[in-house]
Amino acid sequence: MRHYYITGPERVQAFEETVPEPGPGQVLVRVAFTALSPGSNLHVFRTGGYGGSSSQPEEAVYMGSGVVEAVGDGVTRVAPGDRVASVGVGHQEYAVLSEGQVHRIHGELGLRDASLAYLPTWSVSALHLGQYAAAETVVVVGLGLVGLSAALMADQMGARVLGIEVDAQRAEFARGLRLGAVEQPGADGATEPIAEFLGDAGADLILETSGSWHGFKQAVGMARDWTRIAVMGIYRDLPPGDLALELHGLLYGFPSKFHYQRLQIIGCGSDPADVVAPNPRLATTHRNFAYTLERAAQGKLPLGKLVSHVMRPDDLESVLRRMADGDRSYVGVVFEWQAE
């Protein structure tokens, strides 16, 4: 079977491997689609490893879908023949995953669309952590795949959603999701519709997904009293000096947003895998995944609108290189391993 690895900065190589056997608690999946992470996969491609350049090949693991071929002892949630969405899968023809990494697909939801289900699932966690309440106004800063997934889930949960994206191409793609509004800060005529959408009440919750310090500044600048900023993006580099001073002034200059406006800044990982006492919350990643797939199967969560490109597996390196070179048209990229 083919299995693609990152073998150095901006190098991808396919290896031929034996199809693995599932052990106890594991599931063998015949992969149908894999999807790119615009954050971690691109970071590993650029640097050659998760912690910088590595002497060993690195898997570009993220999300996908496929059909269960076999299960190990003790597996009860899925059976051979089940269609599943998965998280933590590499770009490979077959994958052995733990039972907790696969989630059964119901109804007519296709494998292509289900391959992207992980990011909307993570968005459920972000909305939980951001203390979202129904009918609130949610601003999503950055409309790459993470931001689009978050905006789509917030919209599905009943939020008034305003998408903010500085890139014209991505803003136009985002308008296809039919959110409350999508605006491009800095473009002619954008200020008035943003102010009109937010009204006097302003933003209740801002999901900062860009991973850019400029995006974080945008989020802080849009906050009002008691606004919650839930940070989904990862800031891999230090902010430029001038921008760091601007942020310090916004957050801590008198009257500081952080103190006087009671701004909340929340880091967003995922909900726990299992309910752990004494935490009274029942939200888990498994329940969130089941919810996402259920709503998508019901036609209430159009995951297909997140797909911008369907590619062949051997296009992996060229797609990553185009993304690394700044091509912003690649948003939701999936690789087709098996025809549906």
Residue ranges with predicted function:
Residues 113-188, 192-193:
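Mid-domain Rossmann-like dinucleotide-binding core that forms the NAD(H)/NADP(H) cofactor-binding site
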Residues 20-36, 47-90:
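Glycine-rich beta-strand-centered segment in the early N-terminal region that forms part
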